[in-house]
Amino acid sequence: IDEFLGKGYPMTNMDTGEPLRSIRERILSANAYLGAFPLAEALRTGAGVVVSGRCADAALALAPAIYTYGWRPEDYDLLASGMVAGHVIECGAQVTGGNSLANWRSLANLEEIGYPIVEMQPDGSFVVTKHPGSGGRVDSHGVKEQLVYEIGDPRAYYGPDCVTDFTSVRLADDGPDRVRVTRAAGAAPTDFLKLSINYSAGWKAVGTLVYTSPFAREKAQEAD
């Protein structure tokens, strides 16, 4: 960190614009969000288990596709497909009904909700599904809701391997509990990486569960 600051990089807080120097003496840890290619290289060398530092969530899904299909750093549309796939499944059961408000009354067996599976193709198209017989549901409504989860500008979702345009993506139901995802578009990544920093600033613990209208009370009672 001191080396980058010494070279003149401002390293400002992406929410407040506050310079890093203002908290430098209180920093406890710092982790850059790395991309998928080092993970794919580990797979290429025969690793059965890959232990990584902090990487982008979607890199965990993108790396196996890079390794399996030989995608290159300049294959931005393909990398964007992997980023979309990783983003869709990165929060587990959110995309199988755990975070879906569409037709929520008909979601079955949520206490045994299934976790998502991506069936990736060499051209970057993929199907989102789940294990047969597990609870929840995979449909285009749930995938759409997960697509816009924590992304900022949907036309420019920044990652270490590419910038993804989520507005280019097309969804189609592909049978029960199957959604096909196509046409992801990508562009070259920026010269920057996201840096997560923990620093000492006292402590606060807050827990919140939010249920949106309509029928917010009924949803909360159903979840109890």
Model-derived regions, located:
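A conserved active-site cap/scaffold subdomain adjacent to cofactor or substrate pockets
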Residues: 77-183
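Conserved active-site and cofactor/substrate-binding residues in soluble primary-metabolism enzymes
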Residues: 34-38, 45, 79-83, 138, ...
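An acidic, phosphate/nucleotide-engaging active-site surface
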Residues: 2-52
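Gly/Ser/Thr-rich loops at beta-strand to alpha-helix junctions
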Residues: 54-60
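Short, solvent-exposed amphipathic alpha-helical segments in soluble enzyme
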Residues: 56, 65-70, 146-148, 224
